[in-house]
C-alpha cells in the first residue's frame, strides 16, 4: 500500500470479530510523499468461548510545509468471554498519543506551535440475554492529557514573542450504567436502569523560562457528578 496524502489527525481503529476458531495476524505498511508512513499490526484469537483483538499502529508525516510534522502511536485491545449461553463479559482499552506541529498560514507563519496529546478509554461490561429478558452492567473510563505550546509568529514586526510557559490540561470521565429489560407479553417491553457519571478536568500553565520557571499557574479545576434512574414501559398498540 502507498499513501500519497499526509495524515491530518488521529487514526481510529475499527475491529471486526473473528467467526472461526484459530489465530490470525495481519500487518500493513504504507509509505508515500512527504515522508509519510502508515503501519498497523493486528492479532485476532478465537479459542472456545474466548475472543481477543490486539492492535498497534504508528503513523507519521513531515507534511507539505516546514514545521508541519505529525506522528501518532496507537494501541487497542478487546477481550471477550462467553460465560454461558446467557452471559458474557467484554473489556477493551484504546490509547492514542500524537505529536503535532502547526505552522500557521503561509502569509503569517508560526514557530514552536507544538502539541503533545494522549487520550485513552477503557470499558468493561457484563451482559445477559435470556430471550424474554436481557440487560447489562457497564463501566467505562475516558481520559486525556494535553501539553501545548501556543507558538509565536515569526514576523519581526509582530510583538507576539516566544511563550515562556506551556499550556497543560487533564480531563477524565467515568461512569457506571445498569439496565434490565423484559418482555412481559407480546408487544410489551419494560426497562429499568440507573446511571452514574463523573466528569471533569483541570488546566494550568507551566512556566519553563524566565523568573517564574518551574511555577504553575492554575486556570481551572472542576468536576461534576450525575446520577439518574429510569423506568421505561412500552406497548405496541394493536399487538395481540
Where are these regions (language model features)?
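N-terminal periplasmic accessory domains that precede
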Residues: 1, 5-28, 39-42
Amino acid at each position: 500500500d502507498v499513501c500519497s496524502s499526509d495524515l491530518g489527525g488521529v487514526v481510529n481503529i475499527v475491529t471486526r470479530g473473528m467467526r472461526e476458531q484459530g489465530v490470525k495476524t495481519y500487518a500493513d505498511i504504507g509509505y508515500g510523499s512527504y515522508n509519510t508512513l502508515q503501519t498497523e499490526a493486528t492479532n485476532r484469537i478465537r479459542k472456545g468461548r474466548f475472543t481477543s483483538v490486539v492492535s498497534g499502529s504508528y503513523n507519521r508525516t513531515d507534511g507539505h510545509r516546514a514545521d508541519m510534522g505529525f506522528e501518532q502511536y496507537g494501541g487497542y485491545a478487546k477481550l471477550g468471554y462467553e460465560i454461558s449461553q446467557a452471559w458474557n463479559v467484554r473489556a477493551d482499552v484504546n490509547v492514542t498519543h500524537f505529536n503535532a506541529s502547526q505552522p500557521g498560514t503561509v502569509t503569517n507563519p508560526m514557530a514552536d506551535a507544538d502539541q503533545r496529546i494522549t487520550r485513552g478509554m477503557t470499558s468493561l461490561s457484563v451482559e445477559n440475554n435470556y430471550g424474554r429478558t436481557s440487560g447489562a452492567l457497564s463501566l467505562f473510563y475516558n481520559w486525556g492529557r494535553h501539553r501545548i505550546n501556543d507558538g509565536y509568529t515569526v514576523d519581526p514586526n509582530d510583538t507576539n514573542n516566544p511563550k515562556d510557559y506551556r499550556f497543560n490540561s487533564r480531563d477524565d470521565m467515568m461512569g457506571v450504567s445498569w439496565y434490565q429489560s423484559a418482555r412481559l407479553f407480546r408487544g410489551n417491553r419494560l426497562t429499568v436502569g440507573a446511571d452514574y457519571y463523573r466528569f471533569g478536568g483541570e488546566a494550568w500553565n507551566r512556566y519553563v523560562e524566565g523568573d517564574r520557571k518551574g511555577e504553575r499557574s492554575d486556570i481551572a479545576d472542576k468536576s461534576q457528578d450525575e446520577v439518574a434512574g429510569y423506568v421505561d414501559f412500552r406497548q405496541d398498540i394493536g399487538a395481540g
